């Protein structure tokens, strides 16, 4: 199922807020529609919103080119539009990474250009490259992650939120590894946390695994401890929205709790994420900005009120798992293990040398 597709002058997105009961596509012809789709979670997952934002910049450049203004002022407008796109989801670093990558390319080559049509062409090519790269690195991550399970059979994986094909441009990060294990005949079953309050595990992870005929059992978030206590889980694999140089991991709210449970039950806790998820400007997870979302996501479910009027609500979209709880980080360049400051720095050197 295609979740992101660029068609001439239009970004087509699978509306993930409608899953699993409806398959509806949103057609974005304006960069503000892309920004809204990201903010409202019609497209979500750190890699996916990075890809979507890069395509959104094509539409932003088109709009800037329609302004009756000198080329330099059109460029200024494009840069302003790009900042608005970056602000839609503050925690997922892939979004800023993709936007900054595209805009940096424009600034590097702007001296050789004289019109916004040239800028549009440049951004279009780069956005397509970013999308294609995501597809490729998902496969490489899947292969790297599978090496952690060599010689094992009947593996039971617990995952939290959705780090699958719906969250990326390819196979998925955490679920990419799951798919590889299934392909190898090693996977027995996936246990998917429903992931309150927006149920990404129930609506998205269970949906895409079921569609692909991969055995999956849905559980509420507060059943993870039971599953571990009763020997139903062999490993945990999750995705990530931002990883610091220490190896602290920001991911969907509830991930930290799963990591604590895994540590207590001596179950390996793996994080699967591409290089673009690493934030080399931050050392500590406590410095990661955490997006706070609207109260109604907690006080209602599918439009039905489930809490008293006027109740105070705490609704962070993410939490941070300390690096001490992370067994290994799966990347497209291989598996990173503690000491993370050293292994992450080595990852950076490898990528920057290419």
What are these language model-derived features?
Residues 172-183, 259:
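Histidine-anchored nucleotide/phosphate-binding helix
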Residues 26-42, 76, 147-151, 155-159, ...:
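Short, hydrophobic/aliphatic alpha-helical segments
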Residues 187, 194-354:
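Conserved phosphate- and dinucleotide-binding cores of soluble alpha/beta proteins
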Residues 27, 31-34, 46, 50, ...:
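Generic structural signal for well-ordered, non-membrane alpha-helical segments
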Residues 14, 52, 96-98, 158-162, ...:
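Short beta-strand segments
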Residues 40-56, 89, 94-95, 162-170, ...:
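Conserved phosphate/anionic-ligand binding catalytic regions in large, soluble enzymes, centered on
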Residues 2-113:
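Long amphipathic alpha-helical segments
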Residues 94-156, 186-188, 192-236:
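Ligand-binding beta-strand-loop-alpha-helix segment within the catalytic cores
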């Amino acid at each position: 199922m295609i979740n992101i597709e660029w068609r001439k002058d239009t970004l087509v997105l699978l509306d993930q807020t409608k899953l699993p009961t409806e398959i509806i596509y949103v057609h974005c012809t304006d960069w503000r529609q892309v920004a809204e789709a990201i903010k409202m979670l019609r497209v979500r997952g750190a890699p996916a919103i990075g890809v979507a934002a890069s395509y959104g910049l094509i539409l932003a450049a088109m709009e800037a080119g329609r302004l009756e203004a000198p080329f330099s002022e059109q460029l200024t407008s494009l840069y302003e539009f790009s900042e608005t796109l970056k602000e839609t989801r503050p925690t997922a670093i892939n979004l800023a990474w993709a936007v900054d990558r595209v805009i940096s390319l424009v600034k590097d080559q702007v001296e050789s250009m004289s019109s916004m049509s040239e800028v549009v062409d440049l951004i279009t090519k780069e956005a397509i490259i970013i999308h294609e790269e995501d597809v490729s690195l998902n496969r490489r991550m899947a292969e790297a992650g599978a090496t952690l399970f060599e010689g094992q059979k009947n593996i039971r994986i617990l995952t939290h939120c959705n780090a699958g094909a719906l969250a990326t441009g390819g196979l998925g990060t955490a679920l990419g590894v799951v798919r590889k294990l299934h392909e190898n005949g090693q996977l027995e079953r996936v246990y998917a946390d429903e992931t309150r309050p927006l149920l990404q595990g129930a609506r998205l992870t269970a949906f895409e695994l079921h569609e692909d005929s991969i055995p999956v059992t849905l559980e509420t978030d507060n059943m993870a401890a039971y599953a571990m206590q009763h020997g139903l889980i062999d490993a945990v694999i999750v995705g990530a929205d931002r990883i610091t140089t220490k190896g602290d991991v920001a991911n969907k709210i509830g991930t930290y709790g799963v990591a604590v449970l895994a540590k207590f039950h001596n179950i390996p806790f793996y994080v699967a994420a591409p290089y673009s998820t690493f934030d080399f400007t931050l050392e500590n997870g406590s410095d990661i900005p955490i997006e706070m979302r609207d109260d109604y996501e907690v006080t209602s479910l599918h439009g039905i009120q489930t809490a008293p009027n006027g109740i105070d609500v705490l609704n962070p979209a993410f939490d941070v798992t300390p690096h001490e709880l992370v067994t290994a980080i799966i990347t497209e360049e291989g598996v990173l293990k503690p000491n993370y400051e050293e292994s992450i720095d080595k990852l950076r050197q490898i990528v920057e040398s290419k």
